[in-house]
Amino acid sequence: MKRKCFIAVVLLLVGVGGWLLYYLSDQQVIKRTFTALAVSLSKDGEETPVMIALKMKPVKDFIAPACEVTVPERNYHEMLEPGLITHYLIAYRSRQANLHVALEEILVKIPSKGRGEVSALVHVTANYNQPDFFEETHRVMFSLQKQEKNWLLHKATLPDALVRR
């Protein structure tokens, strides 16, 4: 009886340990981070400046001190700081009455220790029930680097159609 109980406890511990390894793996952490950022970028109606600041803080914290932003169709290639990127995002959000951002098909590759490559489909829906309603899906690419146990965005490749709105 003690042996069966011991085996059950060991199997339970192995199962919990395996689940924790999966849940806390770098790939899953990155996917959860990107999903949370998509929620932060979404907007439902008017927002106070305090709400905007609270929503943009996780975005700003996720961006490296110098982030390379590339828009291949425009031959745009620039190194931007987190504050400037959040200002661009706030300006983009302010032009929309409401905005829903969802990341789908998030593919995470860890080519080497401390480096990550992310490819995702960004699904943007804005201005529902408005004359200027739009719904678009675009492929975006990101490069991440791990610094002090946190993943930071170092490079973003965005399509022109996503930037021009």
Give the ranges of each region predicted by the language model.
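Short, solvent-exposed secondary-structure junction/capping segments
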Residues: A38, K57-Y76
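Short Lys/Arg-rich amphipathic alpha-helical segments
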Residues: Q28-K31, D44-T48
